Each structure stands twice: as structure tokens, then as C-alpha cells.
């Protein structure tokens, strides 16, 4: 499993179809700025709106561009086991280095149900698995104790992406899960990434690194080298950007930002729509304020 910064890459569209030219340009921007992993088909990649055929294209292109320079982790979670396994097999076939598996949304399983779900998945793939906790989207919060039990019993469950903003839960993750050998804890929120990393976390699965990959990598490296003040300076230099990338539903603001920067068209798939005029103004001012444009 990687450590460092993994970019939750957007999926560019042009007139309703995949925009592979823009996607490749964005991937090269990431690799050239030393990103450690590309997270394809996560929340930021609009995964629920992507067909199986399109998934193949996106995964293969990410592998082609990344080569041996960055891991390609594929979001392959759904709200039911059969569809999740289908997505996993698709990821395996197309060369994924690992899997990001979100807790099953809508069904609202118990903690025991979550344990059985991840155990079943673990038994049906040899790829390394990141458990993805994002209760604001799924309606369910997987507890640190449940993750500990899963990782203890499932040899290929290797990491947690924690997108619960509760510092109490983040601290419990760090206290409990660090007892596991070779288990990684990733921040799923850019605005609390500095705190998690400074407390012993292993990396960030980042939205902001679509825009500022090198700066996110530098922040991680400073913390790893014990240069906390330098990392803190980066964190607060871009804190407004971290917050404003969520003033509308992700990935609406980050796609707006990337369109302003000239990387992609400002296009999403329904039910998501482009940023409002007021949001576009805020994003433009934010990018100018932190020196991105």
C-alpha cells in the first residue's frame, strides 16, 4: 500500500462523453508533480455515473500514464455486494494496484454487517483494500473497532480512508489502528489532513491535489521529515482553498477550479450540475488568493 498523497482524480467530460485528452493531461500533471497514487473512480471521479466500459478506459489510461511512478487505486464500492464484486473484477482485469471500497450506502448496515461485507470482499480478491468511511455521503459510520476487527481477520485490508471530520474518531483511529502491522491511515479531508499527518497518519486521499499536487506532496514530506512548521505553513496557505472546494457538492467546485485553470471543461453528469455563478466567483478569487492563477 502506498503512503503519501493520493489524488482523487476527477473524470473530465466533453459533450457527455469521456474527455480522455484532458484526463491524460491532468494525469501527467499529477505524475510530473510527484504524486504517490492516483485514485480513479472515487467520489471525486463521479463513480456512480460511470459505465463499466468507461471504467475500463479510465483505469487503463491511468495505468498507462502512471507506469511505475504512482499506484493506481480504483474505487470499486457500491451499495450491494454483487455490484461491488462486479466492479472489483473489472478493476482487477484492467490492472488496478489496489481498491478503495466505500461503506455500502443507503442500506445502512450494522457494524456486524459491515464486518461481514468487507470480509466477503476480502475473500474474493487478492488486491489490497482501503476501507473508505464517509458518513456524510453514505449514512453509516464504520467505527475504529470494526475496522480493527476487519483488518485483523482480513490480510489484504491494508488501510482506512477516514473522511469523518470528528477529531474524536480520528484520534481513536490513530490510537487503535496503529497497533496493526503495516496498516495505513489516510485522511479523506484536506482541511484536517495536516492534523492527521502530524499525529501519525500515513497520507491523504486528496481533492485539492488535483489543483496543487506538489504542495500537498511537500506538506507530507515536511511532516515525515519532522519539519512541522513548514508543513503547517503550507496547510494554512491553502486552507481557504481546502474549505472552498466544498462550498458545493464535491466534485462541483474542483471541476470549476480545473476549468478555470484550463485543464478540463466545466462539465458534470446529472444529477450533478456545474457550479453557480457565485461559486465560480469565489473559486476564482480563491485560486488567485493562493497564487494558483
UniProtKB/Swiss-Prot annotation:
Q: Where can this protein be found? A: Cytoplasm
- Quote the catalytic activity from the record: L-aspartate 4-semialdehyde + pyruvate = (2S,4S)-4-hydroxy-2,3,4,5-tetrahydrodipicolinate + H2O + H(+)
Q: Give residues annotated as binding pyruvate.
A: 44, 205
Pathway the protein takes part in: Amino-acid biosynthesis; L-lysine biosynthesis via DAP pathway; (S)-tetrahydrodipicolinate from L-aspartate: step 3/4
Entry annotation: catalytic residues: 132, 161
- Bilayer-spanning residue ranges: none
Q: Which top-level group of life is the source organism from?
A: Bacteria
Biological-process GO terms, alphabetical: diaminopimelate biosynthetic process; lysine biosynthetic process via diaminopimelate
First and last residue of the signal peptide: none
Per UniProt, the keywords (alphabetical) are: Amino-acid biosynthesis, Cytoplasm, Diaminopimelate biosynthesis, Lyase, Lysine biosynthesis, Schiff base
Molecular functions per Gene Ontology = 4-hydroxy-tetrahydrodipicolinate synthase activity
The record's annotation in SUPFAM superfamilies points to:
Aldolase (SSF51569)
**Where is it chiefly localized?**
cytoplasm
Q: Spell out the Pfam families in the cross-references.
A: DHDPS
Q: Name one GO cellular component term.
A: cytosol
Where exactly is the site Part of a proton relay during catalysis?
Answer: 43, 106
Report the SS bond pairs: none
Quaternary context: Homotetramer; dimer of dimers.
Function, please?
Catalyzes the condensation of (S)-aspartate-beta-semialdehyde [(S)-ASA] and pyruvate to 4-hydroxy-tetrahydrodipicolinate (HTPA).
NCBIfam families, sorted: dapA
Q: Which family, according to UniProt?
A: Belongs to the DapA family.
This chain's protein is named: 4-hydroxy-tetrahydrodipicolinate synthase
From the UniProt record, report the name of the gene that encodes this protein: dapA
